[in-house]
Amino acid sequence: MPKQCRHLLQTSDLSMDEIKLLLKKASVYANDFNAVSLEVKEKIHNKIIVALFFENSTRTVSSFEIASLRLGAKMVKLNMQTSSTSKGETLIDTFKNIHAMQPDAIIMRHAFSSAPFKLVEFSQCPLINAGSGTSAHPTQALLDLLTLYQHFGSLENLKGKKIAFIGDVKNSRVANSNIKLLQRLGLEIMLCAPSSMLPSTPLIKTTHHIGEAIEFADILMSLRTQTERHNTPIFASLKDYANAYCITQKRLYDHAKNKEVVILHPGPVHRDIDIESTMLEDRRSKVLEQVKNGVAMRMAVLEFLLVD
């Protein structure tokens, strides 16, 4: 096992040239998941990847597993609810024990924002952050970028575009990673949420009114209300939240005018709470493209860390 290796804990770990390389690789895989070169297949064949997910996941863990299999690697998924952490083993000891088995890469999700940044010092294989607390989810930001790259045609065309994040921005690691990445690429950003769901970001535009966000934006990213991270209820019900912040056909008609606004959501989507059901079937919704691109981008990331 190499003594030095690359990790992906946050998007700032990547140079702009590396981001462009990942977009190029992922674009090929998005067009054809089977377009894995013989050289890559030979180098990655039978490599073992361990998934340590201490929080629930559907899209991320599944797409990493599918990405691994399509590249020819093998994934071991541990059920952390039945692991020795439930018996009192510390996170560091769990990680060290898994690492001692010499996997070729570890993919990790944890409720604590600091977890992967503390554990990386013990890792001599690539460590990929698949979501840490409210701080970072780099592969989600990269697949979202791939989706926008496909739609607008180039990074140059993305520069100067306006994106509004609507919903529980404060508790969203997806928003945090996307904001940092998209700012590097020259996009303008607005955050739309009630005060209790807005982070302290004095240099970023904010609004409490979804109509203002829609008028501002070329791209809307809806975010799930993360009630599991709230100490006290913010709205009496999710229906009350939807009345203020759901992306609906009427709101787009009233405020987007003739703009072809792109609609994104990292999932899971709360239908008719985050986005109106009819809008999820609308041509402007790229939600399923995001899911497909999750496999493609994660194939590119694994190839980048394990082969390049």
Curated annotation (Swiss-Prot):
Its EC number is 2.1.3.2. It comes from the Bacteria. Pathway: Pyrimidine metabolism; UMP biosynthesis via de novo pathway; (S)-dihydroorotate from bicarbonate: step 2/3. L-aspartate binds at K87, R173, R224. Carbamoyl phosphate binds at R59, T60, R109, H137, Q140, G267, P268. One of its GO terms (biological process) is amino acid metabolic process. SUPFAM superfamilies: Aspartate/ornithine carbamoyltransferase. Keywords: Pyrimidine biosynthesis, Transferase. Belongs to the aspartate/ornithine carbamoyltransferase superfamily. ATCase family. Heterododecamer (2C3:3R2) of six catalytic PyrB chains organized as two trimers (C3), and six regulatory PyrI chains organized as three dimers (R2). Catalyzes the condensation of carbamoyl phosphate and aspartate to form carbamoyl aspartate and inorganic phosphate, the committed step in the de novo pyrimidine nucleotide biosynthesis pathway. HAMAP family: Asp_carb_tr (MF_00001). This is Aspartate carbamoyltransferase catalytic subunit. It comes from Helicobacter acinonychis (strain Sheeba). The lineage of its organism: Bacteria, Pseudomonadati, Campylobacterota, Epsilonproteobacteria, Campylobacterales. The gene is pyrB.
